[in-house]
């Protein structure tokens, strides 16, 4: 304990010098012990209320089994509107300038009634309420700061590591009457003042926050004159694509060894090293991060070499699994061990949206994000330049594959556009468009086809979705540079445990990447322990496409190829072989690509109560509050 305190008190440069005195294979373990996550060891029962810091205050949060920011957003807004309706207080919902919060406007005449209501309404039992001052709008410089009631139900996981609280509060603001108009106390995205007595209507929740997906079928009451669609709202579907491999699968290893016996050119040491294919369940948590922090995604496509993760329910409507045999059907349908080759075919996925995010399984969303973090509302994509460079000169067999591909990209950009590129892209989700990838394939057909045919990384490859697409799109006015809060950590580096500890404590990054390109196999066990500790703490709530733990434990006894084979057999029979252990598989060609599946969205609550221990969620119940003065429904715009 004394050594731990001394180490943590030392300046970082001194820590690094001490660590470098250790043998290389021991550094990661020692640093992890000295700087790993502190606290959080107590596991609280579901339904318990535990003290947590939240929004600058200390409050008590309910321990729940699963929750997402979108579900909590709905929970808070539903409870407030239910309480107001039960008390007969007129209101309207409107878009908050903070996309993670909701707003409800009430006439100032009802301020005293609302003040009493928040202390007594059954719908708000257990809610945290605070009154804050907000600044008036720019066109009201003479106005005094206004009071806003923030109302939320704090929730946390069993370790109290994640708090879903004040950040997602519903804010009640008080509008003042001036003759025949009502005036907002602060800025909002639509209107500063409006006529008295506007027609009440119910609208899709998507009109109230850009975080809410178009497919969300919750409806809330507002004024007809507030039912406008903002020009900066993304209205087109966005999908996500992953490539994944389980390098420990015996049958996959046989396929890899057979392919290594017939190489298609000089093979760089990194091109087939073990760490490139090592599976630590990162995909499970990366997909969790999408479910939690990007509910606006339409569907997730998972490309595998006829493998299935043991934890994935491939029958879930949000997930479509695509095999290499399908992706490379016109090239013989063989397994590929080359990420550049697989990436060169992404635009050929049946049913994929024009706009999509491509992620490696070591990339995670770190907090709630909007579609506009990746695409402008007019469809233009964003890309995120890295300060790292891939060097000058032509690609050589001795170049690391990523550098060789960057040099090949540069050669084509020079020929097509007359400019020279030198920078890599950050390891973030890549915002891509199918039409641009098709254009690249048509223009550079020979090189794209050659890349797709290389079964291992080759110095002649192109890296299309991670570099070439971005520059090509930029130089054809279809993409622009963007900004993103980002963290990159090499799993084998001694500084990584301390950086993960900071990520857990601050949760201050939009995206983080936990990369492992060329680690010593002797450190794999330590890295696995580090991730097994970090990822469940950062993303503790399972997604709906994950199977129950007891089912996963049984499925882990089989290899990833065996799981695929069982599920594929179930798919051909039109039934499950041994449900729920072997769920029927939804694969690319068998999935109905014309159907747009609604994502699993917010809590379907019969307010005012919340089932203890879990937020109810799914498509089976609707927002059921009754409007005392019902108006017509408006469809999403």
Spans of model-derived segments:
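N-terminal anchoring/stem segment of glycosyltransferases
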Residues: 31-110, 206-326, 477, 514-520, ...
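Long, charge-dense tracts
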Residues: 59, 67, 71-223, 227-232
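Compositionally biased, low-complexity flexible segments
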Residues: 576-594, 599-636
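Long, low-complexity C-terminal extensions of enzymes
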Residues: 85-87, 110-158, 464-466, 470-575
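GT-A fold catalytic core of metal-dependent nucleotide-sugar glycosyltransferases
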Residues: 308, 313, 345-390
């Amino acid at each position: 304990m004394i050594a731990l305190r001394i180490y943590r008190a030392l300046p970082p440069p001194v820590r690094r010098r001490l660590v470098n005195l250790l043998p290389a294979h021991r550094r990661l373990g020692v640093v992890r012990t000295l700087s790993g996550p502190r606290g959080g060891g107590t596991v609280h029962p579901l339904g318990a209320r535990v003290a947590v810091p939240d929004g600058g205050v200390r409050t008590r949060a309910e321990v729940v089994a699963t929750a997402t920011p979108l579900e909590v957003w709905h929970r808070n807004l539903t409870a407030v509107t239910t309480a107001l309706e039960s008390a007969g207080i007129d209101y309207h919902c409107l878009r908050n300038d903070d996309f993670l919060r909701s707003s409800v406007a009430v006439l100032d005449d009802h301020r005293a009634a609302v003040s009493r209501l928040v202390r007594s309404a059954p719908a708000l039992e257990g809610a945290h309420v605070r009154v804050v001052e907000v600044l008036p709008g720019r066109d009201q410089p003479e106005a005094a700061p206004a009071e806003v009631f923030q109302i939320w139900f704090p929730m946390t996981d069993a370790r109290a590591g994640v708090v879903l609280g004040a950040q997602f509060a519903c804010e009640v603001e008080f509008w003042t009457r001036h003759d025949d108009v009502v005036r907002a106390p602060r800025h909002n995205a639509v209107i500063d003042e409006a006529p008295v007595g506007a027609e009440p209507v119910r609208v899709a929740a998507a009109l109230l926050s850009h975080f809410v997906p178009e497919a969300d079928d919750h409806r809330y009451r507002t004024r007809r004159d507030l039912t406008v669609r903002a020009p900066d709202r993304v209205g087109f579907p966005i999908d996500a694509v992953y490539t994944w491999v389980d390098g420990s699968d015996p049958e996959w290893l046989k396929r890899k060894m057979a392919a290594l016996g017939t190489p298609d050119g000089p093979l760089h040491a990194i091109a087939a090293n073990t760490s490139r294919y090592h599976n630590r369940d990162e995909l499970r948590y990366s997909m969790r991060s999408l479910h939690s922090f990007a509910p606006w995604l339409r569907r997730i496509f998972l490309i595998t070499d006829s493998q299935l993760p043991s934890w994935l329910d491939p029958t879930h409507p949000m997930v479509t699994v695509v095999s290499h045999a399908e992706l490379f059907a016109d090239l013989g349908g063989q397994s590929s061990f080359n990420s550049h080759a697989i990436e060169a075919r992404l635009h050929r996925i049946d049913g994929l949206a024009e706009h999509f995010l491509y992620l490696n399984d070591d990339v995670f969303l770190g907090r709630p994000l909007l579609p506009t973090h990746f695409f402008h509302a007019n469809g233009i994509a964003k890309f995120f330049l890295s300060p790292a460079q891939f060097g000058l000169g032509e690609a050589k067999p001795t170049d690391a594959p990523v550098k060789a591909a960057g040099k090949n990209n540069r050669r084509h950009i020079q020929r097509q556009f007359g400019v020279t590129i030198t920078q890599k892209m950050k390891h973030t989700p890549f915002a891509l468009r199918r039409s641009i990838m098709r254009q690249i394939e048509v223009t550079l057909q020979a090189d794209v086809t050659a890349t797709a045919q290389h079964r291992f990384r080759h110095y002649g490859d192109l890296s299309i979705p991670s570099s070439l697409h971005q520059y090509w799109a930029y130089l054809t006015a279809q993409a622009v540079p963007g900004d993103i809060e980002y963290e990159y950590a090499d799993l084998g580096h001694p500084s990584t445990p301390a950086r993960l500890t900071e990520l857990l404590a601050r949760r201050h990054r939009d995206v983080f990447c936990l990369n492992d390109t060329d680690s010593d196999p002797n450190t794999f066990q330590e890295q696995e322990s580090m991730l097994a500790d970090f990822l469940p703490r950062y993303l503790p709530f399972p997604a709906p496409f994950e199977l129950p733990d007891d089912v996963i434990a049984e499925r882990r006894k089989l290899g990833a190829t065996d799981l695929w084979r069982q599920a594929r057999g179930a798919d051909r029979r039109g039934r499950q072989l041994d449900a729920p252990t072997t769920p029927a598989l939804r694969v690319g060609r068998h999935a109905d690509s014309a159907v747009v599946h609604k994502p699993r969205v917010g809590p379907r609550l019969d307010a005012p109560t919340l089932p203890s221990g879990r937020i109810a969620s799914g498509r089976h119940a609707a927002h059921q509050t009754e409007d005392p003065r019902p108006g017509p429904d408006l469809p999403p715009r």
